[in-house]
């Protein structure tokens, strides 16, 4: 089963998790990380790293974030590069996350990414989709050769 780390501004992440658990019962491998004003990037990174390890069973983890480019999204992006089968999704809402509940058990992380972006477009995107639009910078020659 795919793990979920829901990370949003203020108390929104915990509110989403609480609403899901109220309706569906306790969710395994699902953690909420709230990003409050004044929280340092270092502390946010530590909290999200802990949540990643708690949610991961080896099948993959999906970071569900509220705003692309915001601190929770940026930290999730950095963490995803260090762990295989991690995806970063932005623009999520409670109804969309509810739609994806059953997919946690049947899809791979990349299949999940494609499906949630398809269902939530155009507001929902992923780190992978953003990277396809803006591929990383690659040097075509060695700068240090004389």
From Swiss-Prot:
Protein name: Putative phosphotransferase enzyme IIA component YadI
Entry function: The phosphoenolpyruvate-dependent sugar phosphotransferase system (sugar PTS), a major carbohydrate active -transport system, catalyzes the phosphorylation of incoming sugar substrates concomitantly with their translocation across the cell membrane.
Keyword Thylakoid among UniProt keywords: no
Keywords of this entry: Cytoplasm, Kinase, Phosphotransferase system, Sugar transport, Transferase, Transport
Membrane-crossing residue ranges in chain numbering: none
Lineage, highest ranks first: Bacteria, Pseudomonadati, Pseudomonadota, Gammaproteobacteria, Enterobacterales
Gene3D superfamilies: Phosphotransferase system, mannose-type IIA component
Domain notes: The EIIA domain is phosphorylated by phospho-HPr on a histidyl residue. Then, it transfers the phosphoryl group to the EIIB domain.
GO annotations of cellular component type: cytoplasm; transmembrane transporter complex
Catalytic-site annotation from UniProt: 9 (tele-phosphohistidine intermediate)
Gene: yadI
Coiled coil: none
Cellular localization per UniProt: Cytoplasm
GO biological process, one term: phosphoenolpyruvate-dependent sugar phosphotransferase system
One MF term in the entry's GO annotations: kinase activity
């Amino acid at each position: 089963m795919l793990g979920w780390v829901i990370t949003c501004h203020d108390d929104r992440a915990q509110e989403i998790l609480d609403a899901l658990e109220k309706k569906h019962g306790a969710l395994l491998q699902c953690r909420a990380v709230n990003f409050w004003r004044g929280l340092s990037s270092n502390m946010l990174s530590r909290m999200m790293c802990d949540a990643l390890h708690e949610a991961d069973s080896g099948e993959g983890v999906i970071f569900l974030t509220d705003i692309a480019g915001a601190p929770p999204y940026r930290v999730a992006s950095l963490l995803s590069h260090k762990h295989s089968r991690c995806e970063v999704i932005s623009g999520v809402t409670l109804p969309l996350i509810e739609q994806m509940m059953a997919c946690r058990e049947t899809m791979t992380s990349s299949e999940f990414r494609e499906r949630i972006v398809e269902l939530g477009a155009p507001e929902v995107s992923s780190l992978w989709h953003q990277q396809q639009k803006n591929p990383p910078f690659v040097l075509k020659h060695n700068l240090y050769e004389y």
